A protein has these predicted regions:
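Enzymes that bind and transform nitrogen-containing heteroaromatic metabolites
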Residues: 1-184
Length: 184
């Protein structure tokens, strides 16, 4: 069975807004590139999809080597966007307007590599339903003080207990925390 993995950068105070956080350095970028090697499908919400593309498609042709690799991989991967309003999508993307929990549970059963969840908007819903198997939080050494957070107040119905799998401290001071859902 495929695993569903959530991986995201966030500040010490839990801010996940891309505009509030610095870009990863080469070592952190390499970590995300390696993580993406075991993935063949990415799931986004509409807003994150519209932030990521066409940015990464363009970046794949203009950036340094690490960003080029990441952009090319991201653009080439199959993607699903969960949206009721998006009319069209590009870059190997299909739009799904049904329940994300049901769709991702179906996709987990299909043959293939892991599924990467690239949005926090669905995190409470997916986490509570037990869809997400692993969490990779890369903590940036800063307090953002504002912006969207990993989980907004009131969106998680009950606590989510996780089990630590691994940690990594990058030279930049960024810290990767790898968790899996705790077995009941």
């Amino acid at each position: 069975m495929r695993k569903v993995i959530l991986a995201i950068n966030m500040s010490i105070d839990g801010c996940v807004g891309h505009m509030s956080l610095p870009a990863p350095d080469e070592e952190v970028g390499g970590y995300f590139n390696n993580l993406m090697r075991d993935v063949d499908l990415i799931a986004y919400g509409r807003k994150m999809y519209e932030i990521m593309f066409p940015y990464w498609a363009d970046e794949a042709n203009l950036a340094d080597e690490l960003d080029t690799q990441f952009g090319q991989r991201l653009t080439a991967l199959d993607k699903v966007v969960f949206s009721r309003t998006l009319a069209s999508a590009e870059y190997n993307t299909r739009i799904v307007s049904t329940d994300p929990v049901e769709e991702l549970l179906k996709l987990k059963q299909a043959a293939g590599k892991n599924i990467y969840v690239g949005t926090v908007s669905m995190l409470p819903q997916l986490a509570q339903a037990g869809v997400i198997d692993e969490y990779h939080f890369v903590v940036v050494p800063m307090i953002a003080g504002q912006g969207p957070h990993l989980v907004e107040d009131g969106t998680l119905a009950e606590k989510l207990n996780l089990e630590l799998v691994a940690t990594k401290i990058f030279k930049s001071g960024w810290i990767m925390l790898h968790y899996k859902k705790r077995a009941e």
